[in-house]
Amino acid sequence: MSNNETIYESVIADLLKEIDRATAKHPFFPCRKHPAFVLIAEEYLELTRAINDNESDARVIEEAFHTAVTLLRFITEKRKNPDLHAENERIEEK
């Protein structure tokens, strides 16, 4: 196993732990695009602030994980409930 594989495995393991933590803390994830977009934007802005404010690497990585988890939860919900999302999109168009 190369060093990159080891690093990727470690990151993925940490990401899975963070997904479990986030899901336990916030079990509901919005299905409509607009509320989901707001959550994604908030996490991205927190990551951007951590970088721009020269916060510690640990803090930047923490915010990067939060952003990644939010994106993964969005993707997961889209795949789990495609009919629900299609219905929500029709409702939003009215």
Model-predicted regions and their roles:
Residues 1-94:
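Flexible "arm" and connector segments at domain edges
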